[in-house]
Amino acid sequence: MRHARGYRRLNRTHEHRKALFANMAGSLIEHEQIKTTLPKAKELRPIVEKLITLAKRGDLHARRQAAAQLKQDSHVAKLFDVLGARYKDRQGGYVRIMKAGFRYGDMAPMAIIEFVERDTSAKGAADRARLEAESAADES
């Protein structure tokens, strides 16, 4: 019987799962849309929804709780400064999951997870800024 099985283990240890979702939540906050497998997306959604709720609270304790779950301070800053303000009037449902076919090679079901009312220019913006900074450093 599968009573009281509250989450998917995804064939990973607790530490690996914790690191996986910290990285994925950070990527979703940074790019506002990521493509991953459907089970990972379904597990990521409640984690990110709780982080947005913390960002809407906006106090120091909430910021520290979010920083404990995320790996980079820049993700915490964007979460509280941009996303918390964007969703201050929305009562939940900050993230949508759309099925995206199957992965070639192992036929794993894929999904796109994204913020509702997302900023379409955010996807890849950090990568472009990093590349421009590296090229400017190489030239000088």
UniProtKB/Swiss-Prot annotation:
One of its GO terms (molecular function) is structural constituent of ribosome. The keyword Ribosomal protein applies. GO terms for cellular component: cytosolic large ribosomal subunit. GO terms for biological process: translation. The keyword Protein biosynthesis does not apply. SUPFAM superfamilies: Prokaryotic ribosomal protein L17. InterPro entries: Ribosomal_bL17 (IPR000456), Ribosomal_bL17_CS (IPR047859), Ribosomal_bL17_sf (IPR036373). Keywords: Ribonucleoprotein, Ribosomal protein. Belongs to the bacterial ribosomal protein bL17 family. Part of the 50S ribosomal subunit. Contacts protein L32. This is Large ribosomal subunit protein bL17. The lineage of its organism: Bacteria, Pseudomonadati, Pseudomonadota, Alphaproteobacteria, Rhodobacterales. The gene is rplQ.
